[in-house]
């Protein structure tokens, strides 16, 4: 049966976060994550950077689906940050919102977060992997390698980049660490000027705490930004939910597994434009909204589209706009802590993601590669128009994925 709501058509946003806050939907006793003040500041820094990154991308990808993983980008650039020196390090520190944190604090915080977040919920698969691949004949600074290995658990390998099998070796690592969802990040032929790849990979698979019944999934109307209508599969469920609403949007929280992770969907009010909602997303607002979620008094229906998306882009221009231009300048970049001889700069930051949402749960993956070159309304909640959703871990407020969907695809 086709269903329709008389509402304004607005673009769809998808935002997936890793968020830490108490989730009443979970029935198990929660063991809190003990975060130091530095770790709390790092989480806040990653969220600030992730939201700035998302907004900048959305400017360029208007009325398009967007899906990124801020934490993946942050970790790949976090390893790179260990090789920066002088004004280049200062520029990266500012762009990544790391002011007030020493590099030692940054490294120790990432180490603890990697160890903690991957072990929180036995019913949710959440994996983080890092690697560094350098050209044989190029000798990276050993202290740089030691730091990335110790704090980011990075696998470090020297390869003959001229060997036709070298890209396959790197891409096989990517494929393995995203459970086959992202097949490659390195081109078939590696540019002779590239001397290193710093790569982060993330894989997430969460089963809904309360799964959707496939028998209730039906065709429904989804309203696109150009006023057209797309027929998509709408999943349906009636339950009690943690909710929040204000003049701009309504939001519902859907837990995974034991409740350590969840997806939060932000649906703009019908008369609001989704881009105006994006403009209001910042770290402080997000934390305020999440703290305001409460359990609904009554059960109500929600309708969510099934969708699958593969997304990718080069982040060079976006990162330059955020203040990192010097790191991309072969004449100004200073990565002498990575290679003492100098002359090394970032030639490309490539980002790829995957997400699939269905009745069972959500599967998502992300890969970021840094190429270093030498020289609450409780009525029915029907998600049939552009909306925002957040996947979060419910305790640490680290943003994991953030995206924008203007058209559900399978």
Regions inferred by a protein language model and the residue ranges of each:
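Non-catalytic, conformational "gating/processing" segments within enzyme and secreted inhibitor domains
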Residues: 103-269, 290-376
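Composition- and surface-driven signal marking solvent-exposed, interaction-prone regions
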Residues: 5, 211-214, 266, 276-281, ...
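Structural recognition of the beta-strand scaffold that forms the well-ordered cores
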Residues: 67, 75, 262-265, 390, ...
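Short Gly/aromatic-enriched secondary-structure transition segments
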Residues: 92-96, 212-219, 274-284
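Detector for small/aliphatic-rich hydrophobic stretches
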Residues: 2-161, 405, 409
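C-terminal soluble interaction/assembly domains
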Residues: 348-410
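C-terminal, non-catalytic macromolecule-binding modules
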Residues: 283-286, 319
């Amino acid at each position: 049966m086709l269903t329709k709501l008389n509402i304004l058509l607005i673009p769809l946003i998808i935002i997936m976060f890793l968020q830490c806050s108490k989730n009443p939907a979970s029935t198990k006793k929660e063991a809190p994550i003990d975060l130091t003040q530095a770790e709390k500041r790092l989480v806040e820094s990653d969220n600030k950077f992730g939201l700035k990154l998302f907004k900048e991308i959305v400017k360029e990808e208007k009325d398009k689906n967007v899906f990124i993983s801020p934490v993946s980008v942050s970790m790949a650039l976090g390893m790179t940050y260990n090789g920066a020196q002088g004004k280049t390090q200062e520029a990266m520190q500012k762009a990544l919102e790391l002011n007030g944190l020493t590099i030692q604090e940054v490294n120790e915080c990432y180490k603890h977060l990697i160890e903690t977040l991957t072990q929180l919920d036995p019913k949710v698969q959440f994996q983080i992997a890092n690697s560094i691949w350098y050209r044989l004949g190029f000798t990276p600074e050993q202290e740089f390698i030691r730091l990335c290995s110790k704090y980011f658990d990075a696998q470090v390998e020297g390869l003959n980049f001229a060997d036709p099998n070298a890209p396959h070796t790197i891409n096989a690592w990517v494929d393995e660490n995203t459970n086959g969802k992202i097949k490659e990040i390195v081109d078939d032929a590696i540019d002779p000027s590239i001397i290193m790849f710093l790569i982060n990979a993330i894989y997430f698979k969460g089963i809904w705490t309360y799964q959707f019944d496939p028998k209730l999934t039906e065709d429904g109307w989804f309203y696109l930004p150009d006023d057209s209508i797309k027929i998509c599969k709408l999943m349906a469920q009636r339950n009690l939910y943690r909710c929040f609403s204000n003049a701009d949007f309504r939001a519902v929280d859907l837990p995974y597994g034991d409740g350590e992770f969840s997806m939060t969907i932000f649906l703009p009010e019908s008369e609001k434009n989704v881009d105006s909602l994006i403009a209001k997303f910042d770290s402080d607002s997000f934390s305020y909204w999440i703290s305001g979620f409460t359990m609904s008094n009554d059960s109500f229906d929600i309708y969510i589209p099934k969708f699958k998306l593969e997304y990718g882009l080069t982040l060079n221009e976006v990162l330059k706009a955020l203040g990192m231009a010097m790191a991309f300048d072969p004449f100004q970049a200073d990565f002498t802590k990575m290679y003492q001889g100098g002359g090394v700069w970032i030639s490309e930051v490539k980002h790829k993601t995957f997400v699939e949402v269905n009745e069972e749960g959500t599967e998502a993956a992300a890969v970021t590669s840094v190429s270093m070159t030498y020289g609450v309304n409780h009525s029915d909640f029907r998600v049939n128009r552009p909306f925002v959703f957040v996947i979060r871990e419910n305790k640490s407020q680290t943003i994991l994925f953030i995206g924008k969907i203007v058209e559900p695809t399978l």
